[in-house]
């Protein structure tokens, strides 16, 4: 039985569901996620040390980031709308002996059920795959406790991002399957910061994520013209 979600693109869900069995293959289509994951984890930890924290990973997919945060000592819940990806995530966590609570639920639904329940919320490489990213940002803001942190990452919408993230990554270097990204769904940093402020979050840090095709390595930089990450914080309760 197929479940229909209001803020989900069926084509996007099908695309990632078809690849679900390859999530944990470091040489598969998900190789970039495996390679950037240590950078993402260190960046999150530099702002919000995870040990002992309750964390929800929104759009967790096969659980690459979720597992690494659990290994860092967090109590992690991973949510996604791809049932196949969640099965892979659950099986891998069992095999690895890493405790992660996975659930097929929309961010908006979890926010309605458990508002203000998490110290940290992560939503990485996900916003560019949904019809209404602002709705997801609002849900993340609702999920986090006052004084807690919400982390996002996505792709800038400009000519350089189109050339590198779509043409370069998908058609020239073949790092990603063709059709992985829809340029129209890319989000400018100013737009994402606006979504965050409207939702009651305070943008605190903006970093770029760059890939060097000569070295095959990724690095965090101050160039946010293609891939970028933004750290936000929910103000303390008055």
Swiss-Prot record:
GO terms for molecular function: 2-polyprenyl-6-hydroxyphenol methylase activity; 3-demethylubiquinol 3-O-methyltransferase activity; polyprenyldihydroxybenzoate methyltransferase activity. S-adenosyl-L-methionine binds at residues 40, 59, 80, 124. GO terms for biological process: methylation. Disulfide bonds: none annotated. InterPro entries: SAM-dependent_MTases_sf, UbiG_MeTrfase. CDD domains: AdoMet_MTases (cd02440). Its EC number is 2.1.1.222, 2.1.1.64. Keywords: Methyltransferase, S-adenosyl-L-methionine, Transferase, Ubiquinone biosynthesis. It is an enzyme of class 2 (transferase). Pathway: Cofactor biosynthesis; ubiquinone biosynthesis. It catalyses: a 3-demethylubiquinol + S-adenosyl-L-methionine = a ubiquinol + S-adenosyl-L-homocysteine + H(+); a 3-(all-trans-polyprenyl)benzene-1,2-diol + S-adenosyl-L-methionine = a 2-methoxy-6-(all-trans-polyprenyl)phenol + S-adenosyl-L-homocysteine + H(+). O-methyltransferase that catalyzes the 2 O-methylation steps in the ubiquinone biosynthetic pathway. Belongs to the methyltransferase superfamily. UbiG/COQ3 family. This is Ubiquinone biosynthesis O-methyltransferase. The lineage of its organism: Bacteria, Pseudomonadati, Pseudomonadota, Betaproteobacteria, Burkholderiales.
């Amino acid at each position: 039985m197929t479940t229909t979600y209001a803020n989900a693109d069926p084509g996007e869900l099908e695309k990632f569901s078809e690849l679900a069995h390859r999530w944990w293959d470091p040489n598969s289509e998900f190789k970039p996620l495996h390679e950037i994951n240590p950078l993402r984890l260190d960046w999150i930890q530099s702002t919000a040390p995870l040990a002992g924290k309750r964390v929800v990973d929104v759009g967790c997919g096969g659980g690459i980031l979720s597992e690494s945060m659990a290994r860092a000592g967090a109590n992690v819940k991973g949510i996604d709308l791809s049932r196949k990806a969640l099965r892979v995530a659950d099986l891998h966590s069992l095999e690895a002996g890493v405790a992660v609570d996975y659930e097929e639920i929309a961010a908006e639904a979890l926010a309605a059920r458990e508002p203000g329940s998490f110290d940290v919320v992560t939503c990485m490489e996900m916003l560019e795959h949904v019809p209404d990213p602002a709705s997801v940002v609002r849900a993340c803001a609702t999920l986090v406790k006052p004084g807690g942190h919400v982390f996002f990452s996505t792709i800038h919408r400009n000519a350089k991002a189109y050339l590198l993230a779509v043409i370069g990554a998908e058609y020239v270097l073949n790092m990603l399957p063709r059709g992985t990204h829809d340029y129209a769904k890319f989000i400018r940093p100013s737009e994402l910061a606006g979504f965050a402020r409207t939702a009651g979050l305070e943008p605190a840090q903006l970093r770029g994520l760059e890939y060097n095709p000569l070295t095959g390595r990724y690095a965090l930089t101050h160039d946010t013209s293609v891939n970028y990450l933004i750290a936000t914080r929910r103000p303390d309760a008055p």
